[in-house]
């Protein structure tokens, strides 16, 4: 609630008419807004299908219904844990391990690859947005510089993550270095042999799974297709919200604002980004692109009802269901991931 209070303080400091916000919200077309809500649900569904395409290839046993619940559970944790950028993935990892769906290394590989695909699409969306703005004559120097910084940051992270995923020796050296440090800190009292062996086994599963993706682009392409559909639904939500307020906006503005917000959330640095800060960022970006202040704040609130509060409550229901009814699915196929010969 502190985040929401901060958002309303932000509105007050920038002299946004709160009564105007309420009056504008009351004019929203309920039918169009209902479609926006439906698109918000479809966004999560296709995100789930995209991720499950990767888990299926790695023989991680999980039905589409179960995967959908896992994603909703992760979204719920995203809103309450101040490490939003990775908390949902950690939650899904925990659930898959708890329900014995597959080896830890393979599970992490599926989430790692899925995050890489999402970040790549984000970069494409940012570039497309700035091109549309440029040719539309709406380019703001501040927004342009922000997009450049975000795009470079995400691209650099993608590059580093790809290198890490294929350099098994680096990971093994990191494990060895970490265990030596731990032994020095504990003066040799901590016996790290068993834990080190487990870490090496997990690392092998992870890197073998990433090699499998490398030699089978079909699963990556299919996942990328569904993730693209996810993005279309995601971008349609704010567009429909503005449409419901009888204020159509350009797709370039939607691309830019959505990409910047999602880009910051995608950077794994543990920023508590779910309540307060995104509202301020969205309102500022809308205003900087010519949307009246009261309308910008109203649209932000209506969008966040769908992308935050609806997810919070549905995620809470999913969390309760999964905790009360753990999976009874059989243990995943113990066969290790095959390693293709190096070309």
Regions flagged by a language model, labelled:
Residues 73-78, 109-121, 226, 298-307:
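Alpha-helical transmembrane segments of multi-pass membrane proteins
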Residues 95-103, 279-295:
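Interfacial segments of multi-pass membrane proteins
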Residues 76-83, 259-279:
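Transmembrane alpha-helix interface/packing and boundary motifs in multi-pass membrane proteins
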Residues 1-72, 132, 141-262, 266, ...:
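Predominantly cytoplasmic-facing regulatory/coupling regions of multi-pass membrane proteins
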Residues 75-86, 103, 115-127, 131:
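Mid-bilayer segments of alpha-helical transmembrane spans in multi-pass integral membrane proteins
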Residues 52, 90-94:
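Helix-loop junctions and terminal segments of transmembrane helices
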Residues 65-69, 84, 88, 100-116, ...:
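Membrane-interface alpha-helices at helix entry/exit sites of multi-pass transporters
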Residues 72-90, 98, 186-195:
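Short intracellular "coupling" helices and adjacent cytoplasmic loop segments at the cytosolic face
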């Amino acid at each position: 609630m502190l985040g929401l209070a901060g958002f309303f303080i932000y509105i007050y400091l920038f002299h946004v008419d709160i009564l105007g916000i309420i009056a504008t919200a009351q004019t929203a077309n309920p039918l169009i807004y209902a479609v926006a809500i439906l698109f918000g649900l479809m966004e999560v569904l296709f995100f789930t299908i995209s991720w499950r395409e990767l888990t299926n290839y790695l023989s991680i046993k999980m039905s589409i219904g179960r995967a959908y619940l896992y994603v909703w559970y992760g979204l719920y944790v995203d809103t309450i844990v101040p490490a939003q950028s990775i908390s949902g993935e950690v939650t899904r990892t925990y659930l898959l391990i708890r329900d014995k769906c597959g080896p830890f290394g393979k599970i992490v590989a599926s989430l790692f690859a899925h995050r890489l695909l999402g970040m790549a699409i984000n970069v494409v969306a940012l570039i497309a947005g700035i091109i549309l703005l440029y040719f539309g004559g709406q380019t703001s120097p501040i927004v342009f510089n922000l997009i450049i910084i975000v795009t470079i940051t995400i691209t650099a992270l993608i590059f580093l993550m790809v290198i890490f995923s294929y350099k098994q020796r680096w990971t093994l050296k990191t494990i060895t270095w970490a265990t030596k440090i731990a032994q020095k800190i504990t003066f040799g009292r901590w016996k790290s042999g068993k834990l080190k062996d487990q870490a090496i086994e997990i690392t092998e599963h992870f890197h073998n799974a990433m090699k499998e993706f490398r030699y089978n682009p079909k699963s990556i392409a299919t996942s990328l297709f569904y993730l693209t559909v996810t993005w279309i639904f995601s971008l349609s939500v704010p567009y429909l919200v503005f449409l419901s307020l009888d204020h159509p906006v350009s797709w370039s503005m939607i691309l830019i604002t959505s990409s910047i917000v999602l880009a910051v959330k995608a950077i794994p640095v543990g920023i508590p980004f779910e309540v307060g800060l995104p509202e301020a960022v969205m309102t500022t970006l809308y205003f900087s692109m010519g949307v009246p202040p009261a309308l910008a704040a109203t649209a932000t609130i209506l969008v966040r009802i769908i992308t935050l509060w609806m997810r919070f409550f549905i995620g809470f229901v999913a969390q309760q269901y999964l905790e009360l009814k753990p999976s009874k699915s059989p243990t995943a196929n113990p066969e290790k991931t095959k390693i293709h010969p190096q070309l």
